[in-house]
Amino acid sequence: MAGAKEIRTKIASVKNTQKITKAMEMVATSKMRKTQERMAASRPYSETIRKVISHIAKGSIGYKHPFLTERDIKKVGYLVVSTDRGLCGGLNINLFKATLNEFKTWKDKDVSVELGLVGSKGVSFYQNLGLNVRSQVTGLGDNPEMERIVGAVNEMINAFRNGEVDAVYVAYNRFENTMTQKPVIAQLLPLPKLDDDELDTKGSWDYIYEPNPQVLLDSLLVRYLETQVYQAVVDNLASEQAARMVAMKAATDNAGTLIDELQLVYNKARQASITNELNEIVAGAAAI
């Protein structure tokens, strides 16, 4: 059994670690709430653009935008959104597993995959696998800016426009609630059609578009795709903070359990030490 002094040192060390994990839990909770607000604020904007795009596309029967046209798929592009930091449980690895399953499906169909990566964890993971990375963005921080994300998005948009990829997907962790974050892979290009129920056809959409619907459609499509990826980044950030909060709470609770166990061991060691001292005193007295 370890000595009492050694056990006291271990208890002090675990208590210091517990303070750190508790502080990280509180910080993650605060950041998660702020990110949730940002996520909720950007979602209506994205949804409205999507509806406008669908109405313009339905009204321009003679014009087929390439972003809305299905192709034979020979090569696909994936924008994968991961975190820059760790200590967030299995958040990243669950997403990576989901993407690798998709990549295997494409490989079985003899379709190659190209990647645009957001987040340093994804960069290191996919580069170690030797996959083809077209673009990467890291260090977005807790307040991601659209300007930092646009480059990676436009790289994939241009690749689709030039026929270098035939479909584009975005992969990220969707924030469901504090305890649940779900890996999601959604198609960006060609843009999936909205159902009539989602379009809200009962509303008044008899608009005159300037300069003309085709030019407006091209501009809106690019803006919509940028917004969708930004939404994915914010969603993933909220998931990261929630996962980190849960992980740090578990670490704090485990530290408390370990402290209790060490305290029990310390008490037993102290009791054994006192018993030995008493035995020595009694033995000495008997010898006299």
UniProtKB/Swiss-Prot annotation:
InterPro entries: ATP_synth_F1_ATPase_gsu (IPR035968), ATP_synth_F1_gsu (IPR000131), ATP_synth_F1_gsu_CS (IPR023632)
A single GO cellular-component term on record: proton-transporting ATP synthase complex
GO BP term, pick one: proton motive force-driven plasma membrane ATP synthesis
Keyword Transport among record annotations: yes
Subcellular location: Cell inner membrane
Annotated Pfam families: ATP-synt
Major localisation: membrane
Assigned keywords, A-Z: ATP synthesis, Cell inner membrane, Cell membrane, CF(1), Hydrogen ion transport, Ion transport, Membrane, Transport
Membrane topology note: Peripheral membrane protein
Leader peptide range in chain numbering: none
Taxonomy, superkingdom: Bacteria
Molecular-function GO term, any one: proton-transporting ATP synthase activity, rotational mechanism
Family as reported in the entry's similarity comment: Belongs to the ATPase gamma chain family.
Function comment: Produces ATP from ADP in the presence of a proton gradient across the membrane. The gamma chain is believed to be important in regulating ATPase activity and the flow of protons through the CF(0) complex.
Subunit structure: F-type ATPases have 2 components, CF(1) - the catalytic core - and CF(0) - the membrane proton channel. CF(1) has five subunits: alpha(3), beta(3), gamma(1), delta(1), epsilon(1). CF(0) has three main subunits: a, b and c.
Record-given protein name: ATP synthase gamma chain
Organism (species): Actinobacillus pleuropneumoniae serotype 3 (strain JL03)
Gene name per UniProt: atpG
